[in-house]
Amino acid sequence: MSLDFLPFSRPSIGEDEIAAVEQVLRSGWITTGPKNQELEQRFAERLGCRHAVALSSATGALHVTLLALGIGPGDEVITPSLTWVSTANVITLLGATPVFVDVDRDTLMCSAQAVEAAIGPRTRAIVPVHYAGSTLDLEGLRTVAGRHGIALVEDAAHAVGSEYRGRPVGSRGTAIFSFHAIKNLTCAEGAMFVSDDSALAERVRRLKFHGLGVDAYDRLSHGRKPQAEVIEPGFKYNLADLNAALALVQLKRLDALNARRQALAERYLERLAGLPLAPLGLPAHKQRHAWHLFILRIDAEACGLGRDAFMEALKARGIGSGIHFIASHLHHYYRQRQPRLSLPNSEWNSARLCSIPLFPDMRDDDIERVARAIEEILEKRR
Protein backbone atom coordinates (compact mmCIF):
# COMPACT_ATOMS: atom_id res chain seq x y z
CA MET A 1 0.00 0.00 0.00
CA SER A 2 1.42 3.41 -0.98
CA LEU A 3 1.48 6.12 1.67
CA ASP A 4 0.81 9.82 1.20
CA PHE A 5 3.92 11.94 0.81
CA LEU A 6 5.09 13.30 4.17
CA PRO A 7 6.69 16.75 3.70
CA PHE A 8 9.43 17.97 6.01
CA SER A 9 7.13 20.83 7.03
CA ARG A 10 3.50 21.89 6.67
CA PRO A 11 1.67 24.85 8.26
CA SER A 12 -0.96 24.06 10.88
CA ILE A 13 -4.01 25.99 9.65
CA GLY A 14 -7.40 25.45 11.29
CA GLU A 15 -10.90 26.84 11.02
CA ASP A 16 -10.07 29.74 13.35
CA GLU A 17 -7.36 30.97 10.98
CA ILE A 18 -9.69 30.64 7.99
CA ALA A 19 -12.45 32.52 9.81
CA ALA A 20 -10.06 35.31 10.81
CA VAL A 21 -8.93 35.83 7.22
CA GLU A 22 -12.54 35.74 6.01
CA GLN A 23 -13.46 38.41 8.55
CA VAL A 24 -10.78 40.71 7.16
CA LEU A 25 -11.90 40.05 3.59
CA ARG A 26 -15.45 41.02 4.52
CA SER A 27 -14.34 44.10 6.47
CA GLY A 28 -13.31 46.07 3.41
CA TRP A 29 -9.86 46.86 4.90
CA ILE A 30 -7.46 44.16 3.77
CA THR A 31 -4.10 45.94 3.73
CA THR A 32 -2.18 47.35 6.72
CA GLY A 33 -4.67 48.38 9.37
CA PRO A 34 -6.24 47.40 12.70
CA LYS A 35 -5.09 43.77 12.62
CA ASN A 36 -1.48 44.93 12.23
CA GLN A 37 -1.83 47.20 15.22
CA GLU A 38 -3.35 44.41 17.29
CA LEU A 39 -0.66 41.94 16.23
CA GLU A 40 2.12 44.34 17.19
CA GLN A 41 0.50 44.99 20.56
CA ARG A 42 -0.12 41.31 21.34
CA PHE A 43 3.38 40.30 20.26
CA ALA A 44 5.02 43.00 22.37
CA GLU A 45 2.89 41.99 25.36
CA ARG A 46 3.88 38.36 25.01
CA LEU A 47 7.60 39.13 24.86
CA GLY A 48 7.57 42.00 27.31
CA CYS A 49 9.44 44.20 24.83
CA ARG A 50 8.96 47.93 24.31
CA HIS A 51 8.37 48.04 20.54
CA ALA A 52 7.12 45.61 17.89
CA VAL A 53 6.83 46.45 14.19
CA ALA A 54 5.20 44.04 11.72
CA LEU A 55 6.75 43.70 8.26
CA SER A 56 6.25 41.60 5.14
CA SER A 57 9.37 39.43 5.59
CA ALA A 58 12.35 38.95 7.88
CA THR A 59 14.62 39.80 4.95
CA GLY A 60 12.87 43.15 4.57
CA ALA A 61 13.00 43.66 8.33
CA LEU A 62 16.76 43.09 8.39
CA HIS A 63 17.20 45.41 5.41
CA VAL A 64 15.51 48.39 7.06
CA THR A 65 17.01 47.61 10.47
CA LEU A 66 20.57 47.73 9.16
CA LEU A 67 19.72 50.82 7.12
CA ALA A 68 18.24 52.46 10.22
CA LEU A 69 21.48 51.68 12.05
CA GLY A 70 23.37 53.59 9.36
CA ILE A 71 25.06 50.56 7.78
CA GLY A 72 26.44 51.42 4.35
CA PRO A 73 29.47 51.37 2.03
CA GLY A 74 32.74 50.66 3.77
CA ASP A 75 31.13 49.10 6.83
CA GLU A 76 31.44 45.49 7.98
CA VAL A 77 28.75 43.33 9.56
CA ILE A 78 29.67 40.10 11.36
CA THR A 79 27.36 37.13 10.86
CA PRO A 80 27.69 33.34 10.78
CA SER A 81 28.07 31.88 7.32
CA LEU A 82 25.84 28.92 8.21
CA THR A 83 22.49 30.64 7.82
CA TRP A 84 20.05 31.53 5.07
CA VAL A 85 21.92 33.64 2.52
CA SER A 86 19.48 36.57 2.71
CA THR A 87 21.52 37.99 5.61
CA ALA A 88 24.65 38.24 3.50
CA ASN A 89 22.63 39.52 0.55
CA VAL A 90 21.10 42.37 2.56
CA ILE A 91 24.49 43.40 3.96
CA THR A 92 25.97 43.35 0.46
CA LEU A 93 23.08 45.28 -1.10
CA LEU A 94 23.65 48.05 1.45
CA GLY A 95 27.21 48.36 0.16
CA ALA A 96 28.69 46.84 3.31
CA THR A 97 30.78 43.68 3.64
CA PRO A 98 29.58 40.52 5.40
CA VAL A 99 32.30 39.16 7.68
CA PHE A 100 31.55 35.46 8.03
CA VAL A 101 32.41 33.63 11.24
CA ASP A 102 32.39 29.92 11.93
CA VAL A 103 29.90 28.18 14.20
CA ASP A 104 30.18 25.59 16.92
CA ARG A 105 30.33 22.19 15.23
CA ASP A 106 27.40 20.77 17.21
CA THR A 107 25.08 23.68 18.12
CA LEU A 108 25.63 25.43 14.75
CA MET A 109 25.66 28.83 16.45
CA CYS A 110 28.46 31.37 16.68
CA SER A 111 30.21 32.12 19.95
CA ALA A 112 31.08 35.45 21.51
CA GLN A 113 34.75 34.50 21.17
CA ALA A 114 34.46 33.91 17.41
CA VAL A 115 32.61 37.19 16.96
CA GLU A 116 35.10 39.22 19.00
CA ALA A 117 38.01 37.79 17.03
CA ALA A 118 36.38 39.06 13.82
CA ILE A 119 35.83 42.64 15.01
CA GLY A 120 37.84 45.26 13.16
CA PRO A 121 37.88 49.05 12.80
CA ARG A 122 35.05 48.97 10.24
CA THR A 123 32.71 46.65 12.17
CA ARG A 124 29.33 48.32 12.69
CA ALA A 125 26.97 45.47 13.61
CA ILE A 126 26.70 41.82 14.63
CA VAL A 127 23.86 39.63 13.32
CA PRO A 128 24.05 36.26 15.14
CA VAL A 129 21.49 33.51 14.51
CA HIS A 130 19.35 31.50 16.92
CA TYR A 131 19.39 28.14 15.16
CA ALA A 132 16.57 25.61 14.66
CA GLY A 133 14.72 26.81 17.78
CA SER A 134 17.76 26.67 20.07
CA THR A 135 19.26 29.86 21.50
CA LEU A 136 22.51 31.77 21.29
CA ASP A 137 24.70 32.57 24.29
CA LEU A 138 23.28 36.08 24.41
CA GLU A 139 25.08 37.27 27.53
CA GLY A 140 28.46 36.72 25.93
CA LEU A 141 27.40 38.39 22.69
CA ARG A 142 25.88 41.37 24.52
CA THR A 143 29.07 41.82 26.49
CA VAL A 144 31.19 41.83 23.33
CA ALA A 145 28.85 44.20 21.49
CA GLY A 146 28.73 46.58 24.45
CA ARG A 147 32.49 46.54 24.95
CA HIS A 148 33.09 47.56 21.34
CA GLY A 149 30.09 49.86 20.92
CA ILE A 150 28.63 47.73 18.11
CA ALA A 151 24.95 47.12 17.37
CA LEU A 152 23.62 43.61 18.05
CA VAL A 153 20.65 42.44 15.96
CA GLU A 154 19.45 38.92 16.77
CA ASP A 155 18.26 36.82 13.85
CA ALA A 156 15.39 35.10 15.65
CA ALA A 157 13.72 33.72 12.51
CA HIS A 158 13.82 30.21 14.05
CA ALA A 159 13.13 31.29 17.62
CA VAL A 160 9.54 32.41 18.08
CA GLY A 161 8.60 30.90 21.43
CA SER A 162 12.21 30.14 22.40
CA GLU A 163 13.44 31.27 25.81
CA TYR A 164 16.95 32.18 26.97
CA ARG A 165 17.62 31.88 30.71
CA GLY A 166 13.91 32.07 31.50
CA ARG A 167 13.09 35.06 29.29
CA PRO A 168 11.56 35.06 25.79
CA VAL A 169 13.98 35.64 22.95
CA GLY A 170 13.34 39.22 21.85
CA SER A 171 12.39 40.51 25.30
CA ARG A 172 15.59 42.54 25.46
CA GLY A 173 17.65 44.29 22.79
CA THR A 174 16.77 44.05 19.09
CA ALA A 175 15.59 40.93 17.27
CA ILE A 176 13.80 39.90 14.09
CA PHE A 177 11.30 37.02 13.85
CA SER A 178 10.03 35.31 10.70
CA PHE A 179 6.44 34.23 10.03
CA HIS A 180 7.25 32.37 6.80
CA ALA A 181 5.11 29.38 5.83
CA ILE A 182 7.30 26.78 7.58
CA LYS A 183 7.94 28.75 10.77
CA ASN A 184 6.48 27.91 14.19
CA LEU A 185 4.11 30.87 13.82
CA THR A 186 3.09 31.57 10.24
CA CYS A 187 1.05 34.07 8.28
CA ALA A 188 2.35 32.75 4.91
CA GLU A 189 4.87 35.60 4.63
CA GLY A 190 5.63 38.10 7.36
CA ALA A 191 7.95 39.14 10.17
CA MET A 192 8.22 41.08 13.40
CA PHE A 193 10.96 43.51 14.41
CA VAL A 194 11.22 44.02 18.18
CA SER A 195 13.42 46.40 20.14
CA ASP A 196 13.75 48.42 23.31
CA ASP A 197 15.40 51.22 21.28
CA SER A 198 12.63 53.77 20.61
CA ALA A 199 14.53 55.79 18.01
CA LEU A 200 15.50 52.67 16.06
CA ALA A 201 11.94 51.32 16.14
CA GLU A 202 10.53 54.63 14.92
CA ARG A 203 12.91 54.68 11.97
CA VAL A 204 12.21 51.03 11.08
CA ARG A 205 8.49 51.79 11.11
CA ARG A 206 9.04 54.74 8.79
CA LEU A 207 11.41 52.96 6.41
CA LYS A 208 9.11 49.95 6.01
CA PHE A 209 6.44 52.14 4.36
CA HIS A 210 7.93 54.58 1.85
CA GLY A 211 9.53 56.73 4.54
CA LEU A 212 6.14 58.23 5.40
CA GLY A 213 5.47 59.64 8.82
CA VAL A 214 2.12 57.78 9.02
CA ASP A 215 0.34 55.07 7.02
CA ALA A 216 -3.15 55.15 5.48
CA TYR A 217 -4.92 53.50 8.43
CA ASP A 218 -3.16 55.79 10.88
CA ARG A 219 -4.46 58.81 8.94
CA LEU A 220 -7.97 57.36 8.84
CA SER A 221 -8.18 56.35 12.49
CA HIS A 222 -6.57 59.49 13.92
CA GLY A 223 -8.18 62.02 11.59
CA ARG A 224 -4.88 63.35 10.28
CA LYS A 225 -4.45 65.23 7.02
CA PRO A 226 -5.02 62.96 4.00
CA GLN A 227 -1.61 63.45 2.38
CA ALA A 228 1.32 62.15 4.43
CA GLU A 229 4.84 63.50 4.07
CA VAL A 230 7.93 61.52 3.17
CA ILE A 231 10.43 62.00 5.98
CA GLU A 232 13.10 60.01 4.11
CA PRO A 233 13.05 57.57 1.16
CA GLY A 234 11.71 54.21 2.26
CA PHE A 235 10.51 50.83 1.03
CA LYS A 236 7.31 48.79 0.73
CA TYR A 237 7.68 46.17 3.47
CA ASN A 238 4.33 46.61 5.23
CA LEU A 239 2.27 43.57 6.25
CA ALA A 240 -1.32 43.21 4.99
CA ASP A 241 -4.11 42.72 7.52
CA LEU A 242 -4.96 39.45 5.75
CA ASN A 243 -1.61 38.14 6.97
CA ALA A 244 -1.81 39.83 10.36
CA ALA A 245 -5.19 38.22 11.07
CA LEU A 246 -3.71 34.80 10.40
CA ALA A 247 -0.71 35.58 12.62
CA LEU A 248 -2.95 36.67 15.50
CA VAL A 249 -4.66 33.28 15.63
CA GLN A 250 -1.31 31.52 15.35
CA LEU A 251 0.06 33.63 18.20
CA LYS A 252 -2.77 32.43 20.44
CA ARG A 253 -1.94 28.84 19.48
CA LEU A 254 1.84 29.21 19.70
CA ASP A 255 2.37 27.52 23.07
CA ALA A 256 0.30 24.50 22.02
CA LEU A 257 1.98 24.31 18.61
CA ASN A 258 5.45 24.44 20.16
CA ALA A 259 4.52 21.90 22.83
CA ARG A 260 3.53 19.49 20.08
CA ARG A 261 6.81 20.14 18.27
CA GLN A 262 8.70 19.35 21.48
CA ALA A 263 6.79 16.10 22.01
CA LEU A 264 7.54 15.01 18.45
CA ALA A 265 11.21 15.97 18.76
CA GLU A 266 11.55 14.03 22.01
CA ARG A 267 10.03 10.99 20.32
CA TYR A 268 12.55 11.31 17.49
CA LEU A 269 15.41 11.51 20.00
CA GLU A 270 14.21 8.33 21.71
CA ARG A 271 13.48 6.48 18.50
CA LEU A 272 16.71 7.37 16.69
CA ALA A 273 19.04 6.93 19.66
CA GLY A 274 21.94 4.65 18.85
CA LEU A 275 21.94 5.39 15.12
CA PRO A 276 24.99 7.20 13.67
CA LEU A 277 23.01 10.33 12.78
CA ALA A 278 24.69 13.00 14.96
CA PRO A 279 21.72 15.15 15.97
CA LEU A 280 22.58 18.68 17.02
CA GLY A 281 24.01 19.39 20.43
CA LEU A 282 22.38 21.77 22.91
CA PRO A 283 24.02 24.83 24.48
CA ALA A 284 25.07 24.69 28.13
CA HIS A 285 22.84 27.57 29.27
CA LYS A 286 19.23 27.23 30.40
CA GLN A 287 16.79 27.55 27.51
CA ARG A 288 13.42 26.58 26.09
CA HIS A 289 13.88 25.02 22.67
CA ALA A 290 11.18 25.89 20.12
CA TRP A 291 12.06 22.92 17.88
CA HIS A 292 11.67 24.76 14.61
CA LEU A 293 13.73 22.05 12.89
CA PHE A 294 14.89 18.53 13.69
CA ILE A 295 18.29 18.13 12.09
CA LEU A 296 20.51 15.13 11.49
CA ARG A 297 24.09 15.10 10.17
CA ILE A 298 24.58 12.36 7.59
CA ASP A 299 28.26 11.45 7.40
CA ALA A 300 29.14 9.00 4.61
CA GLU A 301 31.79 7.21 6.67
CA ALA A 302 29.46 6.67 9.64
CA CYS A 303 26.23 6.01 7.72
CA GLY A 304 27.45 4.24 4.60
CA LEU A 305 26.00 6.91 2.29
CA GLY A 306 26.19 10.64 1.88
CA ARG A 307 23.57 13.26 2.73
CA ASP A 308 22.21 13.70 -0.80
CA ALA A 309 21.81 9.95 -1.33
CA PHE A 310 20.13 9.71 2.08
CA MET A 311 17.62 12.41 1.11
CA GLU A 312 16.89 10.65 -2.18
CA ALA A 313 16.29 7.40 -0.31
CA LEU A 314 13.82 9.17 1.99
CA LYS A 315 12.08 10.69 -1.02
CA ALA A 316 11.75 7.26 -2.64
CA ARG A 317 9.88 6.21 0.51
CA GLY A 318 7.53 9.20 0.34
CA ILE A 319 9.30 11.30 2.97
CA GLY A 320 10.45 14.87 2.43
CA SER A 321 13.56 16.50 3.87
CA GLY A 322 15.49 19.75 3.62
CA ILE A 323 18.92 21.35 3.96
CA HIS A 324 19.32 24.18 6.48
CA PHE A 325 21.72 25.47 5.20
CA ILE A 326 24.48 25.62 2.64
CA ALA A 327 26.95 28.03 4.23
CA SER A 328 26.74 31.48 2.67
CA HIS A 329 30.43 31.68 1.82
CA LEU A 330 30.08 28.53 -0.30
CA HIS A 331 27.54 30.14 -2.65
CA HIS A 332 29.00 31.14 -6.02
CA TYR A 333 28.78 34.91 -5.52
CA TYR A 334 30.51 34.94 -2.13
CA ARG A 335 32.98 32.19 -3.02
CA GLN A 336 34.22 34.37 -5.88
CA ARG A 337 34.77 37.28 -3.53
CA GLN A 338 36.38 35.35 -0.66
CA PRO A 339 37.94 32.31 -2.34
CA ARG A 340 40.41 31.64 0.49
CA LEU A 341 37.94 31.83 3.35
CA SER A 342 37.88 28.59 5.34
CA LEU A 343 35.26 27.90 8.03
CA PRO A 344 35.74 24.21 8.85
CA ASN A 345 32.69 23.64 11.06
CA SER A 346 30.34 25.43 8.68
CA GLU A 347 31.73 23.52 5.71
CA TRP A 348 31.60 20.12 7.45
CA ASN A 349 27.98 20.67 8.43
CA SER A 350 26.95 22.12 5.06
CA ALA A 351 27.82 18.80 3.45
CA ARG A 352 25.90 16.72 6.03
CA LEU A 353 22.86 18.64 7.33
CA CYS A 354 19.45 17.09 6.75
CA SER A 355 16.15 18.33 8.22
CA ILE A 356 13.58 15.56 8.61
CA PRO A 357 9.80 16.08 8.97
CA LEU A 358 8.73 18.08 12.02
CA PHE A 359 5.46 20.02 12.20
CA PRO A 360 2.59 20.13 14.73
CA ASP A 361 0.04 18.23 12.64
CA MET A 362 2.29 15.16 12.37
CA ARG A 363 0.90 12.03 14.00
CA ASP A 364 2.88 9.77 16.30
CA ASP A 365 2.85 7.10 13.62
CA ASP A 366 4.49 9.58 11.22
CA ILE A 367 7.50 9.62 13.56
CA GLU A 368 7.53 5.83 13.52
CA ARG A 369 7.31 5.83 9.72
CA VAL A 370 10.30 8.17 9.40
CA ALA A 371 12.32 6.23 11.97
CA ARG A 372 11.67 2.91 10.25
CA ALA A 373 12.59 4.39 6.87
CA ILE A 374 15.88 5.68 8.29
CA GLU A 375 16.65 2.32 9.89
CA GLU A 376 15.95 0.57 6.59
CA ILE A 377 18.14 2.98 4.61
CA LEU A 378 21.07 2.60 7.01
CA GLU A 379 20.66 -1.18 7.28
CA LYS A 380 21.01 -1.54 3.52
CA ARG A 381 24.37 0.26 3.66
CA ARG A 382 25.93 -1.85 6.40
Swiss-Prot record:
EC code(s) of this entry: 2.6.1.87
Lipid metabolism among keywords: yes
Source domain of life: Bacteria
InterPro entries: ArnB_NH2Trfase, DegT/StrS_aminotransferase, PyrdxlP-dep_Trfase, PyrdxlP-dep_Trfase_major, PyrdxlP-dep_Trfase_small
A Gene Ontology biological process term: lipopolysaccharide biosynthetic process
Annotated GO CC locations: membrane
Cofactor requirement: pyridoxal 5'-phosphate
Family of the protein in this entry: Belongs to the DegT/DnrJ/EryC1 family. ArnB subfamily.
Subunit structure: Homodimer.
Protein's UniProt name: UDP-4-amino-4-deoxy-L-arabinose--oxoglutarate aminotransferase
